[in-house]
Design a protein with these regions (language model features):
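C-terminal hydrophobic structural anchor segments
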Residues: 672-705
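C-terminal outer-membrane beta-barrel translocator/porin domains of Gram-negative envelope proteins
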Residues: 423-428, 556-561, 565-678
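Bacterial Sec-dependent N-terminal signal peptides
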Residues: 1-29
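Gram-negative/organellar outer-membrane beta-barrel architecture
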Residues: 381-387, 393-565, 569, 638-652, ...
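Patatin-like phospholipase
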Residues: 25-66, 74-382, 386-389, 393-401, ...
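Outer-envelope exported proteins of Gram-negative bacteria
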Residues: 526, 617-621, 684-686
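Short glycine-rich beta-strand segments
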Residues: 485-489, 530-532, 579-588, 623-625, ...
Length: 744
């Protein structure tokens, strides 16, 4: 009886307990894993899917991503919502980010000159071996953007402790194995996961060479399951196998190769997804970063998710099937995301110490003087960006990146990697005047650690030259130097609308100089010995012939150049001004036993923005010769599209292809109107007017020069491509000209 009473009492207590504690309260909801696949620019569709998931109030407990999916997923994991990522996606200059370009206003004078001549720079290692790059793009711009977007997450012990636990996938080229990032630098993990082989340089990490995770696991469903996900929502950006006619670009070929490599795992992971979303992205590729394409792909991602709305609602019901009402009400996705911390892109924050890694103590002292940031101070994200741009613009580092500690005040570390001691630079161009031209240079002009700087430059063309230059001093300060240049000139000379002859001569120039670059200014002065050996007759402006077979001169020169253009070709703002004076002698004091003769040069031009497509491009140039006796070689020559191509003092006259002999005093003006038709395609109309006179005092009443040209151009990565038609009073005939490549 006592035993029966004890059992009865126990049953009563048991029932009372569960009467006040529902069984479902003991069961949490199911955990949701979001898997974001790779696909380059097509990742915009993932942003559209995120918008619908937020609208449907689908909770996200784990995120696993590959390539662009790692970027979208990584940002979502630290607090950015779909609207934030949408804005980031639309407002980026993707052409700049997916390159190693440096904004021209951040570059030094020397860097501007070299970048606007050469197509490729190949480092030479200390062992004098050619060191080819491991990828077309090092990815510094995109990495520094990731670092900016992930402040506070540069050194993470465990990605499981992020606001939303996160993993991303890369592939180790050394062992051919998949690497899943679960800790460390979040921006570095994102950058490694998107290192498309051959396009982006691999990321070196713990002895591994990491490339795009899509090569082995482009849809990491298995990774999300290992994290603990019960339910998998998968966004797949693939568009199936491309047909032969669709493989027309490098990006489409690389995309197809990556898809082929991970097919077995891809199919298995796709089959294990509880909800599979595959936006319709036919016609778009990993390189479709145009604003119109991004807008369309975001919409298509949203449409694809909305088409699954009923399945989303059923899935949400399944996720909460075993959970009580309080769990459901406390788990609203929108409320949870509002509570997530998110790095600010505009607010200033405090930094603590500043360290610089990768350079010597002497170099560090100089760099600290250059940067405007100070320890234990407040800085803005824009100031960090400006410092990075300045360091990259110096052109002496192959790597400029940074990291910060995770808590404010953030300790700031700049990670620098000096360039190789030497490099080979190569450029090429084609035009209808000289056909093909090639230029090559071997230099150490990108080495800050030495005070000895040299450059050997050669051009192969109808007018070839060889130049050797040595300078001693601070690379970005004052330098003294010497140079030698041997050049062969061969071009047709015209005067008064008629061809005089084909000029041909050889020149040797030896110079000693002082130069200093100060911001956008370059100061230069020196003395130069010129020797000319003529293989043809030299003509005076009146048609008379100079009978000498050679000439020699000892000249003194000084010049100031200011350049604030944002771009050398197709500038949208800024200006360029040059002022130069030269005194010519043949013995250091006299010329032809009389007084020396001199020249004064002024050139000024600018770009004026009228609206987003129209630009006004005025130019003014003049060259005045003073003295009773001026030899034929130093007279005024005009013609062609570039100053100094046929002779160092030849002035461009873009409405005439041939070189024309002018009077001793010349003033020319040009007014151009440039219209950007679409993207990188431009149309330009320009008019030219000038005056020439024997005497300086007669310049205003001198002979008229006029002309005009219409030009269609495309801003190609290997140099501008253009075709133009022109007419000038110098030739009185319609001319046509085609150019492809940088001018040099």
């Amino acid at each position: 009886m006592v035993h029966r009473d004890k059992i009865l009492c126990f049953l009563v207590l048991f029932c009372c307990f569960f009467a006040h504690t529902p069984l479902q309260a003991q069961q949490p909801r199911k955990k949701v894993g979001l898997v974001l696949g790779g696909g380059g620019a097509k990742g915009a569709a993932e942003v559209g899917v995120l918008k619908v998931l937020e609208e449907a109030d689908i909770p996200v407990d784990y995120i696993a991503g590959t390539s662009i999916g790692a970027i979208v997923g990584g940002l979502y994991a630290i607090g950015y919502d779909a609207a934030d990522i949408d804005s980031l996606y639309r407002n980026q200059n993707w052409l700049f980010l997916l390159s190693d370009q440096v904004k021209r206003e951040s570059e030094t004078f020397l860097s501007k000159e070299e970048r606007e001549k050469y197509i490729v720079h190949i480092p030479l290692s200390k062992e004098r071996k050619v060191s080819l790059p491991t990828g077309y793009v090092k990815g510094q711009n995109i990495f520094n953007l990731f670092s900016k977007l992930t402040v506070g997450y540069h050194q993470v012990d465990d990605f499981s402790n992020l606001p939303i636990p996160f993993r991303c996938v890369a592939v180790d080229l050394v062992e051919g194995k998949e690497v899943v990032f679960s800790s460390g630098s979040l921006p570095m993990a994102m950058r490694a996961s998107m290192s498309i082989p051959g396009v982006f340089a691999p990321v070196e990490w713990k002895g591994k060479m990491l490339v795009d995770g899509g090569a082995l696991n482009n849809l990491p469903v298995d990774v999300a399951k290992e994290m603990g996900a019960d339910v998998i929502i998968c966004v797949d950006l693939s568009t199936g196998w491309k047909k032969k006619e669709e493989l027309k670009s490098a990006s489409s070929v690389v995309e197809q190769l990556i898809s082929m490599m991970g097919q077995n795992k891809y199919r298995k992971n796709m089959a294990e997804a509880d909800l599979y979303i595959n936006p319709s992205l036919k016609g778009y590729s990993a390189a479709s970063f145009q604003s119109e394409a991004i807008d369309t792909m975001i919409q298509r991602g949203e449409q694809a998710a909305r088409q699954k709305w009923d399945e989303l609602m059923a899935l949400r019901k399944y996720i909460y099937a075993d959970a009580c009402d309080s769990v459901v009400s406390d788990d609203t996705l929108q409320d949870k995301r509002l509570k997530l911390p998110k790095p600010s892109q505009t607010e200033a924050y405090h930094i603590g110490s500043i360290r610089i890694e990768g350079i010597s103590g002497e170099e560090e002292k100089w760099i600290r003087k250059k940067i405007a940031l100070r320890e234990n101070s407040e800085v803005s994200p824009e100031e960090i960006d400006g410092t990075l741009a300045m360091l990259r613009g110096l052109n002496i580092f192959s790597r400029v990146e940074y990291r910060q500690s995770n808590e404010e005040p953030y300790d700031l570390v700049f990670m620098l990697e000096p360039n190789e001691s030497r490099r080979i630079s190569v450029g090429a161009r084609f035009d209808t005047q000289d056909l093909a031209s090639v230029i090559a240079q071997i230099s150490n002009n990108q080495q800050f650690s030495t005070r000895h700087h040299y450059a050997f430059t050669g051009r192969i063309s109808r007018n070839p030259y060889l130049e050797m230059k040595y300078a001693y001093g601070n690379l970005f300060g004052a330098k003294i130097g010497i140079s030698y240049r041997m050049a062969h000139y061969d071009f047709d000379l015209y005067a008064d609308k008629h061809k005089l002859d084909a000029l041909e001569f050889l020149s040797h120039s030896f110079a000693g100089f002082y130069t200093r670059d100060i911001g956008n200014f370059r100061l230069k002065s020196g003395v130069q010995f010129d020797y000319y050996h003529y293989h043809s007759d030299m003509f005076e402006r009146d048609g008379s012939i100079q009978t000498r077979s050679s000439d020699h001169f000892l000249n003194y020169f000084a010049s100031v150049v200011m350049d604030t253009y944002d771009r050398c070709y197709f500038p949208t703002r800024g200006s360029r001004i040059q002022v130069q004076g030269i005194l010519h002698t043949d013995d250091g004091i006299h010329y032809a036993d009389g007084n020396p003769f001199g020249e004064a040069v002024f050139q000024g031009e600018c770009a004026v923005r009228l609206n987003s497509r129209f630009y006004l491009l005025p130019k003014l140039k003049s060259r005045f010769l003073f003295g009773s006796s001026v030899p034929a070689i130093y007279q005024n020559y005009a013609g062609g599209v570039a100053d100094g191509y046929y002779l160092p003092w030849q002035v461009a006259w873009e409405s005439a292809q041939h070189v024309h002999l002018l009077e001793r005093n010349v003033v020319t003006g040009q007014l151009g109107f440039r219209y950007r038709v679409k993207g990188k395609f431009y149309l330009t109309a320009l008019g030219e007017y000038g005056k020439e006179a024997r005497k300086f005092s007669h310049i205003l009443i001198g002979d008229d020069l006029w002309g005009g040209a219409l030009r269609a151009s495309y801003d190609f990565v290997l140099g501008p491509v253009s075709i133009q038609a022109n007419y000038s009073s110098l030739g009185k005939n319609v001319g046509f000209y085609i150019n492809a490549g940088f001018l040099f």
